[in-house]
């Protein structure tokens, strides 16, 4: 079953809604501190990468648990993990979402010149990747998108090409 067939099956079963996971650590941290005082009892949080990883990982897992019965698709934004230097956690969260039966979209917004796009594509669209699909940016034209498309076809994955995004100034370009 290819990516589009999987997506169509999931939409028929659970509907067209997608849960977006954009874990803004500063917002999460405030709620977390009040609910998990034992993890921050020493008052340290800012400079403690292990506590931050625990907070981020637990929040994301709780989010997946909360949405998995209501939606069949989750779009996980990589930027929030990259900013915290937690790319490995990003992959773990994607794998966990996949194991829960969700169709996993890597919200990467990647593209570049052809050979660089191919390297991005290899990273996220490999046959063993937990991502069913990823988002790509069309700014580089077909040179930037074709490597993603070719590898997605080869490995039964998908791509979503950004068109009109939801941010306020998106109509400017």
Short names for language-model regions:
Residues 43, 92-105, 127-133, 159, ...:
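Short, Lys/Arg-enriched charge-dense amphipathic segments
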Residues 89-93, 147-148:
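A short acidic, amphipathic alpha-helical/loop segment
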Residues 1-76, 81-91, 98-103:
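Conserved N-terminal beta1-alpha1 strand-loop-helix module at the mouth
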Residues 112-173:
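Conserved anion-binding
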Residues 82, 103-117:
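Conserved PLP phosphate-binding loop immediately N-terminal to the Schiff-base lysine helix
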Residues 21, 75-76, 104-108, 133-136, ...:
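General beta-strand structural signal in soluble alpha/beta enzymes
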